[in-house]
């Protein structure tokens, strides 16, 4: 394994590309996620079947109140689906200064089973994908579905994919047989929030300068002058509609300040 320490201010995507260039595996499925390295443990960011917690070793953080340094291990961080201690007990108390990852140097576990990665690799005529091939596929998918925040205001995926009890999913599935899902455990199922939002008719809709992106229903966008309250109002309308139509509650993935 390779133990790699990255400073918090490093651009995340550039860091991922650097690890691939060194033939270090584990982060390639999270290519092109906007932001810096230091923010990744806060959200336990993830994409296409991979999360930060899969390769995370520890992070150093400065206590805001005392300027003392503290090291958080993986166990300390209480990672969950887009969750960590930094969103709850330790919220607004620390500034992460660096993050340590444990990456593979050989016998990489290439993960192409999630989302559209295998389809994209097939389109590119790749049969035995490398780390770089997976990264390129993820980049192509994200660029085709997600708007560039520099060109169209957005915060990426606005909602988490809900994880629901199997019985609850089966009730919703009986009414909507085409509803996709991913098995999380014997008792829980993950449902794509983007599918629910699109099925409810929100994809591509615009409410003044706030709206839902035409290519990816998980992304709320600001067409220019929408206020935070207007974006929030659209998100709550979506949540209420999904709950009413499918009996499934979807939570915001973003942090609302």
Regions found by a protein language model. Give the residues of each.
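Transmembrane alpha-helices
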Residues: 234, 240-241, 250-252
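Phosphate/pyrophosphate- and phosphate-bearing ligand-binding catalytic cores of soluble enzymes
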Residues: 69-221, 225-229, 245-257
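Beta-rich strand-turn-strand
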Residues: 24, 228-231
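Generic structural marker for isolated residues within well-ordered, non-membrane alpha-helices
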Residues: 16, 193, 239
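Hydrophobic pocket-lining residues that define ligand/cofactor binding sites across diverse proteins
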Residues: 19, 242, 246
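Anion-binding (especially nucleotide phosphate/pyrophosphate-binding) glycine-rich loop
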Residues: 1-66
